[in-house]
Regions:
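Long, contiguous, compositionally biased segments that the model treats as domain-scale units
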Residues: 54-187
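Extended, non-transmembrane interaction/recognition domains
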Residues: 175-326
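Intrinsically disordered, low-complexity proline-rich tandem-repeat tracts
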Residues: 3-75
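Active-site neighborhood of thiol-dependent amide/isopeptide-bond enzymes
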Residues: 169-180, 351-410
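Hydrophobic/aromatic-rich core segments of domains that either
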Residues: 191-222, 319, 323, 327-330, ...
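Secondary-structure boundary elements
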Residues: 120-161, 305-370
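Generic solvent-exposed, charged/amphipathic alpha-helical segments
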Residues: 180, 184, 340-344, 383
Length: 421
């Protein structure tokens, strides 16, 4: 065993001087006691108030900037949607059906007090019919039918005649005459009922705006009243008596019957084809046969009234456009004479008595329907074409037994008979 080396002796340390005791710190002043508040009891909780609806903040106004319109985009359906018209409410009014120049007309069927309208001239028929439902239930439909067909005055009278027959065809002719008179009054015509003294035959007295030939007439306060049977046939009588009831409004505003056909009729019918060729001019087309039947026995009026009338605007236009295309519209003596030659030579001649057995002036359209015509018919045709094709001012001139046309050509030096107007 290795002997251990004895450790060095430790030098004793001199004890340090004792430190002076620190002065004792002054004791801190005790803090003042804070007075404690008396303990209060908790307050009763307040009653809950109703919740307040929060107000929506106002949206600030946008600045006034012009808005560019946006074209809406229309969606295209993948399948076409049929355009189905709404179904009209069914008309439950009872109808009466009757024939009018081959057309089936249906108008309201109303009760007519037949037993109260069987006497003439005492006004009782008007009072009884005023108490019926005709004006309220039937008159609007009748006026609508008249407007749809664009019937001129005389054909309104014929439609009323046929309607009255359909309503009370089994009644006496006096009752039917009174019903016709009443309906024509409602249509605005100053037509009077009367009866022939010797036979008691009921008649209707028509006031016209024009003179009517080949008809007997009476005169009352300067107004001519022409005599017609209830069937609107001619009746030649030597003596007649009539009485006019006092009418209340609106029947005071009554008028005469105008025979000039101022508006084309809106009536369809079979067609009659024609072709006219003469002097290098050819005109072809068709006319409405039903209209020809309607005017066959039209009351005879002065010849210029036929030139003022238009039955079918399509027929007028058809002829006039073809004439314009072939001779032009320039107003000169050559064109006027060329048109005159066509009118004089394209038609065969016959008097009315030879062709019909009675005097029958033509409307413009009838010249294209019948195989023959006379001077007054050609004059109407020529005067109409002069006016509508070339705008030539002209007059229809009547000589005893003859009709012709005078023409105004101020830029032409023409020798012959003339007059100044």
């Amino acid at each position: 065993v290795t002997p251990t080396v004895p450790a060095k002796p430790v030098t004793p340390t001199v004890p340090a001087k004792p430190e002076k005791p620190a002065k004792p710190e002054k004791p801190a002043k005790p803090e003042k006691k804070t007075k404690q508040k008396k303990q209060t009891l908790p307050e009763k909780p307040a009653k809950p108030t109703k919740p307040v609806t929060p107000t929506v903040p106002a949206v600030p106004k946008a600045p006034s900037v012009p808005v560019v319109p946006v074209t809406p985009v229309v969606p295209h359906p993948t399948e076409p949607i049929p355009n189905v018209a709404p179904t009209p409410a069914p008309d439950r009014t009872s109808k009466v059906s009757f024939d009018f120049y081959g057309l089936e007309i249906k108008l309201p069927k109303v009760e007519i007090p037949v037993n109260k309208i069987g006497e003439m001239g005492n006004g009782n028929a008007i009072k009884a019919l005023n108490s019926s439902t005709f004006e309220a239930k039937a008159l609007p439909a009748l006026k609508k039918q008249i407007d749809e067909m664009q019937l001129p005055d005389y054909f309104v009278a014929e439609l009323v005649r046929d309607y009255a027959k359909a309503l009370i065809g089994d009644a006496s002719i006096v009752a039917r005459t009174n019903l016709m008179h009443y309906i024509l009054l409602l249509c605005g015509f100053d037509i009077r009922p009367a009866y022939e003294v010797t036979t008691g035959t009921p008649i209707l007295l028509f006031p016209f705006d024009q003179m009517v030939f080949a008809r007997t007439f009476l005169e009352l306060n300067g107004q001519k009243f022409f005599i017609f049977t209830p069937d609107l046939e001619k009746l030649n009588v030597k003596e007649a008596r009539f009485r006019t009831p006092q009418f209340s409004s609106p029947m005071k505003e009554l008028r005469n019957v105008d025979l000039v056909i101022r508006k084309p009729l809106n009536i369809k019918g079979d067609v009659h084809n024609y072709t006219l060729t003469q002097g290098g001019i050819t005109v072809k087309g068709s006319v409405n046969e039903r209209l020809m039947k309607m005017v066959y026995k039209y009351p005879q009026m002065p010849v210029p009234c036929y030139a003022q009338s238009v039955l079918d605007a399509n027929t007028h236009r058809e002829v006039e456009e073809q004439i314009k295309a072939q001779i032009g519209t320039e107003v000169n003596l050559g064109n006027v004479n060329r048109l005159l030659h066509f009118v004089q030579s394209a038609f065969a001649y016959a008097t009315d008595d030879e062709q019909f057995g009675f005097e029958k002036p033509y409307f413009f359209e009838e010249l294209l329907y019948y195989p023959k015509c006379d001077c007054e018919d050609r004059s109407v045709f020529y005067a109409t074409l002069l006016r509508n094709v070339m705008g030539v001012n002209n007059h229809l001139i009547n000589f005893p037994g003859h009709e012709c046309v005078s023409v105004s050509l101020p830029n032409e030096n023409i020798l012959g008979s003339f007059y100044e107007n």
